Amino acid sequence: MVYRADGLQRLTADDLIALRERGLSMVIDLRTDGEINERGRYPIEQHAVAYHHLPVLDRTWQAEDVPEFGTDHDFLMWAYRDILRVGGDKLAAALGIIATAAATPLVFHCAAGKDRTGLLAALLLSILGVPDNYIAADYAKTEEGMVRMRAWAMEQSPEAAARMANSPQHYYASPPGVIHTLLAELRQEHGSVIDFVGGIGVSDATITALRDRLVAPNE
């Protein structure tokens, strides 16, 4: 079992109990060094897991870095192209870790569970043969997570709430059409998603291991 999540530094004692009961064995953290230093990480001192830090971006986007976009779709396509360009090797490394993990369940996460995490999830699901419609629907569920994250910030962290309120609202959208466009673009430019991930360092052996491990056999 593989999960995607948002920032796990916010886990409560009850959350950790639930994760122990589910047998969580590994955490893959896709955030930057700065995010971890500022906000913390999964509390491995309280729940020992294999912890892998793979910073997909060197730093998070600042408002001055981001061009003006008229739609959520256009912003997110710009952002996801940037992530794949800058952090493709880290996404490939994450796929390799998932393929060879000693045990599951495991979880991979970033800050909001949407962009870096959403891209890794989309690539993983596509490798496993999941249809695009299901991948896009899974990504769109992040909207529900964003509502919960905003509510948490309002109650627990005025600083985080202010940061979210002052950031471009494109940051918090997850329209399913973005995943459809992205996967179609990868196929147009590289031939297939498999060819794309091969180009960023995912081996044929890793692809086979992921499928063997995570796809249930037909009865």
Regions found by a protein language model. Name each.
Residues 1-107, 119-219:
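Cys-dependent protein tyrosine phosphatase-like superfamily
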Residues 112, 116-117:
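Ser/Thr-glycine-rich phosphate-binding loops at phosphate-binding pockets of nucleotides
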